[in-house]
Amino acid sequence: MRIHSPYPASWALAQRIGYLYSEGEIIYLADTPFERLLDIQRQVGQCQTMTSLSQADFEARLEAVFHQNTGESQQIAQDIDQSVDLLSLSEEMPANEDLLNEDSAAPVIRLINAILSEAIKETASDIHIETYEKTMSIRFRIDGVLRTILQPNKKLAALLISRIKVMARLDIAEKRIPQDGRISLRIGRRNIDVRVSTLPSIYGERAVLRLLDKNSLQLSLNNLGMTAADKQDLENLIQLPHGIILVTGPTGSGKSTTLYAILSALNTPGRNILTVEDPVEYELEGIGQTQVNTRVDMSFARGLRAILRQDPDVVMVGEIRDTETAQIAVQASLTGHLVLSTLHTNSASGAVTRLRDMGVESFLLSSSLAGIIAQRLVRRLCPQCRQFTPVSPQQAQMFKYHQLAVTTIGTPVGCPHCHQSGYQGRMAIHEMMVVTPELRAAIHENVDEQALERLVRQQHKALIKNGLQKVISGDTSWDEVMRVASATLESEA
């Protein structure tokens, strides 16, 4: 929602009248001249809702509208449909600009719009605006890898970051401490949530913008890229009445997407599903979502305690970070709740060790754990240019070790379709650990991680084997699987 472009905020405040085109509503002050009302009606059409407001309400409506979206969405939507020359835009920007200027034609706003639109077109997950001694750099994280997009004059760094702060409602005068904010954009039917993080450095502030396209999330177990056997195991796990299901992996490995897909599969009128997250990345209809807020001592542990008093059937904790949260999660699972959460470990069996290190007793773990999913994200080979090449002797040895027969594998090439990278999009590789009676007994007996890993391998495929299968099918490359799964090779040795 925003004021129609011919009527910017400054005009609306001065003329005491504004047109909210997405609402089909004209708002005005009680003492606005009648001639002015007639004039705006002639311009926008007669069939509009007319709302008389007090001075305070009028200013509040304008402030809410312009802080949420000051022309960015409309301009971004236009930019997405046309080729944007970021370099020429950065070169025409003056070193000084009115940061509070709401005119979407202002150079700083045009450049911010162009950067955002280019990132959305390229399906970037993050935008990095970085300052160094003599230069500044704007990089996009595309398919998990940072790519330099623009290196404008360093003089523009403070101006760009200050403008982003205005959009995110941060303090533009405070440059000494980190700040976090958000920008909500609506582009056509797409809702884009932009998480903004600023950080002071020795050469000026840096900013990272995380883009969350709420419409791009495919919340279905079918879209997780699991094998038929792993998907069946997961479907069986989430139908259990109680227990803990963990998703493990490093930051940016798709753990949240997997959890949201599980929640969507469980989301029925007969279940009360509650979450505590940091932050709430995607809003799910029919699920009660709570956000961690450390400023008021709203931690994972405190939030988990609270939602357990809300008669839940399924509980999702964004991450188990400390002993208190781990112990509450275990107790919740033992008292009849299905608990979903994440941990930062390299393998599924490593999650057991991590929980033990947090102080959870082995006999409690053996009773509460239902299953663990370890996962990584790998880049997909571009289907337009990928080639199949013979395997090397070293590669053949690895495939043979995992009992996989292969003669050729997919390799990246590079073409205009994938910007010469050889890759387009990402997919997950998984390691599924279902806690069987044998595993439950081993956990109860406090066996070490290596012994537990060997027992898991007897029943389930290793993460790297799942990746190698996708190399054989041409979905990803050998280098990608080695890049993300090499740390798991040590545990198999």
Swiss-Prot record:
Cystine links in this protein are: none
- Record carries keyword S-adenosyl-L-methionine: no
Query: What induces or represses its expression, per the UniProt entry?
Result: Silenced by the DNA-binding protein H-NS under standard growth conditions.
Q: Where does ATP bind?
A: G249, P250, T251, G252, S253, G254, K255, S256
Q: Which GO terms describe its biological process?
A: protein secretion by the type II secretion system
Keyword Acetylation attached? no
Q: Which UniProt keywords apply?
A: ATP-binding, Cell inner membrane, Cell membrane, Membrane, Metal-binding, Nucleotide-binding, Protein transport, Translocase, Transport, Zinc
Taxonomically, the superkingdom here is Bacteria
Write out the GO cellular component annotations. Answer: plasma membrane; type II protein secretion system complex
The record's GO molecular-function terms, alphabetically, read: ATP binding; ATP hydrolysis activity; metal ion binding; protein-exporting ATPase activity
Question: Quick one: which residues bind Zn(2+)?
Answer: C382, C385, C415, C418
- Catalysed reaction, written as an equation: ATP + H2O + cellular proteinSide 1 = ADP + phosphate + cellular proteinSide 2
> Belongs to which family?
Belongs to the GSP E family.
Report what the protein is called.
Putative type II secretion system protein E
